[in-house]
Amino acid sequence: MHFKSGFVTIIGRPNVGKSTLLNGIIGEKIAIMSSKPQTTRHKITGVFNDENSQIIFVDTPGIHKPKNKLGDYMVNSAKSAVDDVDVVILMVDHSTKIGPGDEYLLEFIKAAKVDVILVINKVDLISPDEFKGIYDYYSNLDFIKKIVGLSAINGKGITDLVETIKSELPEGPAFYPTDHMTDQTERTIVSEIVREKVLMYIDEEIPHGVAVEVQSMKTRKNKDNIEIYDIEVDIICEKQSHKGIIIGKEGRKLKGIGKSARQDVEKLLQTKVNLQLFVKVREGWRDNDNFLRGLGYKE
């Protein structure tokens, strides 16, 4: 079999399971996951390798109606991700009825003129009749080339999806070394891990007004000559009242966030970690161009 390689964008509405799917395909946690919509803010590249292919995946923020400059960035980022790719994965689930948001997304993808594989997620939670209804609706769209059902959270159907993607890719060499898994730096992954834990521990709308910025990452040896990573991270919120909620009574919320994040960061870095979290208030940061650029958001 000839070697195949290519670029694939995963796109869909917020909270349909795009990051869960990406992590499942790559086999490592490179995108944070949460039940809250709009968890992913940046495009994330993940690289799948096997003996006869290399697939470069781009996970995107969910397409939604933006309410601020951060939202504008996220939606523009998702839209630009379909440029110059070989295949688009359009991911949907059964939990919401097809509405104006879906129709808008379909019109956008149709205009992109690229091969589209529809992925119906959470098939383990729907009946055969429900699956057929979704399948029939999308199979009538001429730009949908193939349809795959799967459950991203338990891995069912992921292998079939990968084989389907391979069938649509051109022959060509690998773009990255075989041990390359993501384009994210350790610093970026650490900040995303902390943000994931904020999403996990904090309810209501507060998480959407939270940014995370790694201020420093330094290694040192302790008295037993064991390497330790000292990491300082700012959790930035928009209101003083939000700061108190994130910290929690007697600091319990922040301690929980820190403990859970530290465990994941230690797995990532394969070393002991001293993680210090600081909660800071910056009003209106989601509409501040300079601040957004400092966090890595670009037009």
Regions found by a protein language model. Name each.
Residues 17, 157, 253:
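Conserved glycine(s) of the Walker
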Residues 115, 124-186:
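Canonical P-loop GTPase G-domain recognition
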Residues 1-84:
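Conserved G1/Walker A P-loop phosphate-binding module
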Residues 28, 47-51, 66, 81, ...:
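Conserved, well-folded catalytic cores of nucleic-acid-processing
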Residues 49-54, 76-147, 221-224:
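Conserved C-terminal guanine-recognition region of P-loop GTPase G domains, centered on the G4
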Residues 59, 121, 151:
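Active-site glycine-centered loops adjacent to acidic/histidine catalytic or metal-binding residues
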Residues 186-299:
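P-loop NTP-binding site
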Residues 40, 63-65, 97-98, 126-127, ...:
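Catalytic P-loop NTPase motifs of RecA-like helicase/translocase cores
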